């Protein structure tokens, strides 16, 4: 099982930052052609993405909204390229038919971002629109603007809706939207912990300094990992379908599934080694705009 905890956005028109991001501690890199790139730089960014893919780099791409001229150009360029990204994030997703068109054209996993009231209303339809839909998420800044909503709890219902739609469609738990207060790492931790409790897993980030916090929140604690190993070891040795464990807890298929997930997270954390040189304080001019 591949577990991605951190998804780092990097501007598509900055090859220097792309190279740094690919060498850094993020589990996944998203080269952005949308919000992080000015209109004047869109074509240069597109060429940079194609060149970097041709060099063998592995990363995800966020295209512009498919209904826009820039989005149409992004999809056409990636569809024609012989070297494909690992997947494509599709912003402003609202129409399942449009998402199907993008998936058919690209032939790689697609990740619709729901950023409007209509997108949230169509969450399950988007999540099940095509076999290549690999995950759904919220674009919270745009969604809040569309809803004219403010306050910390304003998006509680849409967040729950996305979690339910993703799991109903058999998709992974949604990735949390970016935390835009880059210097507020304590706030990032609190928000990410709340998101994980609510059914999100992993987070989009806009600076390497945010990555260690996200990874720490995503990691199961040692006691939980030990519990999972013990439970799965007993299952393998005894083959029991259900039992009462030593702590008096009834163990059935749902608990076993939870243990497998905990162990997958623990093993994923062991495979990723962060580079401290790439995760220092966040300077204002080293931030990707990804809302």
Annotated model-derived regions:
Residues 1-291:
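Expand to "…catalyze enediolate/carbanion chemistry for C-C bond making/breaking, isomerization
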């Amino acid at each position: 099982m591949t577990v991605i905890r951190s998804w780092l956005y990097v501007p598509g028109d900055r090859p220097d930052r792309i190279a740094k991001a690919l060498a850094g501690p993020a589990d996944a890199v998203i080269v952005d052609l949308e919000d992080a790139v000015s209109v004047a730089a869109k074509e240069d960014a597109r060429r940079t993405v194609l060149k970097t893919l041709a060099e063998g780099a592995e990363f995800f791409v966020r295209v512009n909204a498919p209904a826009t001229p820039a989005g149409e150009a992004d999809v056409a360029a990636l569809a024609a390229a012989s070297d494909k990204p690992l997947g494509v994030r599709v912003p402003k997703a609202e129409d399942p038919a449009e998402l199907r068109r993008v998936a058919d054209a690209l032939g790689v996993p697609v990740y619709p971002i729901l950023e409007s009231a209509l997108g949230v209303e169509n969450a399950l339809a988007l999540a099940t629109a095509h076999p290549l839909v690999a995950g759904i998420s919220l674009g919270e800044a745009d969604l809040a603007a569309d809803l004219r909503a403010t306050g910390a709890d304003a998006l509680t219902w849409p967040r729950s809706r996305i979690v339910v739609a993703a799991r109903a469609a058999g998709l992974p738990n949604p990735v949390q939207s970016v935390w835009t207060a880059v210097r507020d790492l304590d706030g990032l931790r609190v928000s990410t912990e709340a998101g994980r409790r609510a059914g999100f897993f992993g987070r989009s980030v806009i600076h390497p300094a945010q990555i260690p916090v996200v990874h720490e929140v995503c990691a199961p604690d040692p006691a939980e990992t030990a519990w999972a190993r013990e439970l799965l070891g007993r299952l393998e040795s005894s083959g029991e379908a259900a039992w009462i464990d030593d702590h008096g807890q009834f163990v059935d298929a749902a608990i076993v599934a939870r243990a497998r997930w905990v162990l997958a997270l623990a093993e994923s954390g062991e495979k990723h080694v962060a580079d401290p040189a790439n995760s220092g304080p966040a300077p204002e001019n080293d931030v990707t705009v990804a809302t």
